[in-house]
Structure formats: structure tokens, C-alpha cells
Amino acid sequence: MVNPLAGEVTVTVDGVPHCCKLTLGALAEMEATMGAESLVDLVARFETGKFSSRDVMALVVAGLRGGGWDGSAADLLRADIEGGAVGAAQAAATLLVRAFSPPS
């Protein structure tokens, strides 16, 4: 069970639900993968709709790793993500919102 107030999101990979969370380490890895200069640049890509499928993949991988998953981006390329590309993009957007919004 995920805790939205802790920034957690569920992503189901190959039928198995995983807890995702953008930890500081996961964010740093994601910045490097996405070639972002800063967290603001990274968030701006999603806010303006100028993100690629690579960006979504990097965000989902970072969230999965932050939640304790030990897989790789290569593993995720071959996996079935519940909801497909749309489900992955929604999970990525939700991860960003929950990571950078104060709990209400």
C-alpha cells in the first residue's frame, strides 16, 4: 500500500504492483539520465508538455528505484506497464506532483 502523503505512487510492472518514490538519489540519477541542468528544468519539461518517452521512462525508473526496485531501464523496456504509455506518463506526472507538493 502506497502513501500519497509521502510522495508514493503505485506502478504495476508485469502484473506486480511496485511502490515508487522520488528520493534525492533517484532524482539525481534521473537528472543525469535526462540531461537536465536542474530540478526546475526537469519539472518544466513536464509542465510544458515538452517531454519525451525517454523522459517518462527515466522518471518511472527513478521512482521504482526510489521505492526499492532493483531493476534497470533495460528491464523496464521489456516489461508490461499497466496502462501502457499513458499509464506510465500518468504515473510519472503524479510522481513529480507528489514529490514537489507539500502535503495538504
Regions found by a protein language model. Give the residues of each.
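Short capping micro-motif at the N-terminus of alpha-helices
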Residues: 20-22
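Charged interaction scaffolds used for protein-protein
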Residues: 1-12, 17, 36-54, 65-104
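A residue-level signal for conserved active-site and pocket-lining positions in enzyme catalytic cores
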Residues: 60
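Short, surface-exposed, low-complexity cationic segments
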Residues: 24-41
